[in-house]
């Protein structure tokens, strides 16, 4: 669209209380998974893993600001569960290094405090709200209300999993939760999953799932993705499914 990185940021993190601020006290180190990195190293390795060096420069710049903001909110102490990270990246991309220099220390503030800036490389046509993704009250993050158009190319993937494989994933989930959250599957696998509500991000038949039933339990689509399927297996909670009997 020819947007600047500032326009990109204020499009996705959209609220009158959001502003772009320059940090006057940069950290000397950032900790990721127990290891210390210089700020530039951390930004580069994270951006390389998330958007890569071939993305438009303004997009990479906006990514840098989101990364820095996210880390600042975490007091620059991150774990492997926080985000993607490419350890092998060694400062060899001119676009990534230029984006670091152009935005170093810039972050998004919400009425003066670092905003919560989860980031992603692609969306299914528009963004999902924080309430859809994590639950809770939308008032906690009013600048993550969803519905923001996201014009990058969409990636469609097909995942095939047997009923036995899904049963094992449910059993693994049940072993980690208390009895009130354990899933009981019906005898017929065709009845195991039902999508109850989604935001129609891709049309009336597909969107980010805010409510679904698996067995006897109801949960958010992102909870199903993260806690049962695994984030690396099911890459998004914007999905449809079909069941084919053996």
Residue ranges, per PLM feature:
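Conserved, single-site charged/polar hotspot
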Residues: 1-246
């Amino acid at each position: 669209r020819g947007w600047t990185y500032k326009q990109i940021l204020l499009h996705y993190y959209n609220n009158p209380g959001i502003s772009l601020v320059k940090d006057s006290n940069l950290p000397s180190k950032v900790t990721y998974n127990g290891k210390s990195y210089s700020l530039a190293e951390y930004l580069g390795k994270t951006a390389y893993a998330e958007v890569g060096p071939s993305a438009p420069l303004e997009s990479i710049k906006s990514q840098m600001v989101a990364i820095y903001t996210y880390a600042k909110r975490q007091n620059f102490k991150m774990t492997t569960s926080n985000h993607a990270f490419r350890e092998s990246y060694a400062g060899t991309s001119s676009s990534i290094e230029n984006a670091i220099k152009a935005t170093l220390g810039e972050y998004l503030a919400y009425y003066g405090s670092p905003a919560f800036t989860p980031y992603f490389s692609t969306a299914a046509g528009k963004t999902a709200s924080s309430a859809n993704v994590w639950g809770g009250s939308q008032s906690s993050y009013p600048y993550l209300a969803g519905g923001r158009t996201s014009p990058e190319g969409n990636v469609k993937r097909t995942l095939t999993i047997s009923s036995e494989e899904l049963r094992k994933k449910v059993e693994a989930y049940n072993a980690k939760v208390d009895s009130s959250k354990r899933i009981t599957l019906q005898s017929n696998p065709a009845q195991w999953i039902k999508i109850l509500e989604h935001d129609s991000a891709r049309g009336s038949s597909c969107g980010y799932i805010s409510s679904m039933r698996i067995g006897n339990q109801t949960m958010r689509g992102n909870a199903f993705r993260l806690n049962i399927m695994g984030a690396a297996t099911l890459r998004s909670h914007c999905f449809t499914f079909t069941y084919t009997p053996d």
